[in-house]
């Protein structure tokens, strides 16, 4: 329930007036669009565009030489005829002009929620900003615009109005009278249009058109994916939740029998107390706090740490995974936010996709029991089956490819192996180094993904001296892996950046 608005003692002055006509924009080649919304669950559930638990309250449009904000559902009044505005807006969307947004996924999803589809190309200046600098501290329109066009967003009137009305200027903007929002909202579209003009020069300067076009062409498919979502078996999820709670309760009782008290499985001090009672040694951090890593608990020969680890795994499966599925379920489907590029909402600096609300990539895979159990809650479409596809040793192939281009020692044997058939890189490295395949694979992938020495030792399950000896032997007999890593590091240090085959830049300033 919304709290009542406090009546302002002084109304902030504004010169903004709503548009007096609905212009014909079909002759314009570029149209910038920005929506203002009421999206009450945005911070906890993600965009409400699919759930439709919010609404569009106003539409800002800008073209060369003209701009306007069309309020249609401000609680504080001052709205235009909703049906008239939406009919006009649909005509705008159907023009062949390129539609320009900042954070297009948000606005385009709300446009889809309104029942409209966009004709013509879609440009996202946030994607452009991320490709130009994936390490920015902020990707807001205000931040990016200040850097590239030297103009930010003026929020003075909006902040003053929100203060007078006693509301949050961003989250509750929809509650204000439209005239107090119009200036702020309209400038979003104007700045987005100007920003795109500047970003084109930056894309050209950094030679990023190929990767920008790739991301741009991919975008409509991602919107479709978001709205399609993935089916989930809610009944099974609820039953699984109950079953896991029973198992977790039993494990807590088993732990109590050994320790003599109720152990808080996520509290280091509580676990330390239990270890002290049964006289088990444990590590401490540099600051002296008890340390109980997953690997330490899982591989410990005593029953107590094993039970604590198992209870943790079940608790995490129940709270992190199943509760998340139940929370984000919408009519039997999960509609995650897809983070195409790095942004303030998530994403990666490498261009790899990530998901949020919920994060589908966190679904466990390696646990022999919990992995299949949680994954079985996601069900394919009717008359379809899930397919599992993966590249065959993609990381090793890339390493060998680039190492062979540099003619690094030891690569020719691997190249010959790949050329002669379906070679097993990990086994070839194991044979070269005289170690087990499992150990070779752990070291291979650890080095390829920049795993630190301590983490690598933990993954190998060896004590420090034995692990260091094994890694040393690996580097002596398969030297090209470290040699390539060192060469790439030097190049990154010298130029401050590297470029992928697809043209994406990774900066190391």
Residue ranges and their predicted role:
Residues 437-449:
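Short, amphipathic alpha-helical "recognition" segments used to contact nucleic acids or chromatin
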Residues 32, 97-104, 388:
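Acidic beta-strand-to-loop metal/phosphate-binding motif
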Residues 64-99, 230:
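Nucleic-acid-processing active sites and adjacent nucleic-acid-binding tracks
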């Amino acid at each position: 329930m919304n709290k009542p608005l406090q009546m302002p003692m002084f109304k902030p002055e504004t010169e903004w007036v709503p548009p007096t006509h609905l212009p014909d924009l079909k002759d314009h080649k570029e149209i910038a669009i920005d929506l203002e919304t009421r999206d009450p669950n945005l911070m906890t559930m993600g965009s409400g565009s699919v759930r439709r638990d919010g609404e569009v309250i106003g539409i800002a449009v800008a073209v060369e030489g003209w701009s306007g904000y069309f309020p249609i559902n401000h609680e504080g009044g001052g709205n235009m005829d909703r049906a008239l505005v939406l009919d006009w807006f649909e005509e705008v969307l159907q023009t062949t002009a390129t539609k320009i947004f900042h954070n297009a996924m948000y606005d385009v999803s709300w446009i889809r929620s309104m029942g409209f589809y966009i004709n013509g190309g879609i440009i996202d200046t946030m994607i452009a900003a991320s490709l130009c600098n994936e390490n920015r501290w902020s990707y807001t329109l205000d931040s990016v615009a200040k850097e590239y066009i030297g103009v930010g967003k003026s929020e003075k009137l909006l902040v003053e109005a929100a203060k007078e009305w006693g509301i949050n200027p961003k989250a509750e903007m929809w509650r204000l009278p439209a005239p107090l929002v119009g200036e702020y909202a309209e400038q979003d579209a104007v700045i987005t249009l100007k920003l795109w003009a500047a970003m084109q020069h930056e894309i050209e300067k950094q030679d990023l058109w190929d990767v920008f076009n790739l991301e741009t062409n991919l975008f409509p498919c991602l919107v479709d994916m978001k709205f399609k979502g993935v089916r989930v078996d809610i009944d099974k999820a609820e039953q699984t939740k109950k079953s896991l709670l029973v198992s977790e309760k039993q494990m807590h009782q088993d732990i109590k029998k050994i320790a003599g008290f109720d152990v808080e499985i996520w509290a280091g001090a509580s676990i330390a107390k239990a270890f002290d009672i049964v006289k088990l040694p444990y590590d401490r951090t540099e600051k002296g706090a008890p340390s109980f890593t997953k690997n330490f608990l899982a591989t410990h020969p005593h029953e107590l740490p094993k039970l604590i680890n198992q209870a943790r795994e079940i608790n995490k499966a129940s709270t992190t995974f199943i509760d998340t599925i139940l929370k984000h379920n919408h009519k039997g489907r999960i509609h995650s936010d897809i983070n195409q590029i790095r942004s303030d909402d998530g994403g990666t600096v490498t261009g790899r996709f990530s998901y949020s609300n919920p994060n589908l990539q966190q679904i466990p895979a390696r646990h022999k029991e919990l992995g299949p159990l949680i994954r079985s809650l996601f069900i394919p479409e009717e008359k379809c089956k899930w397919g599992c596809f993966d590249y065959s040793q993609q990381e090793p192939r890339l390493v060998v490819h680039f190492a062979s281009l540099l003619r690094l020692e030891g690569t020719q044997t691997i190249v010959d192996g790949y050329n002669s058939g379906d070679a097993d890189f990990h086994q070839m490295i194991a044979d070269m180094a005289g170690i087990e395949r499992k150990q070779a694979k752990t070291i291979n992938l650890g080095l390829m993904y920049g795993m630190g020495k301590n983490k690598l030792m933990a993954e190998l399950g060896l004590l420090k001296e034995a692990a260091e000896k094994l890694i040393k032997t690996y580097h002596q007999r398969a030297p090209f892996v470290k040699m390539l890593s060192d060469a790439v590091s030097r190049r990154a240090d010298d130029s401050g950046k590297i470029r992928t085959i697809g043209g994406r830049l990774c900066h190391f300033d």
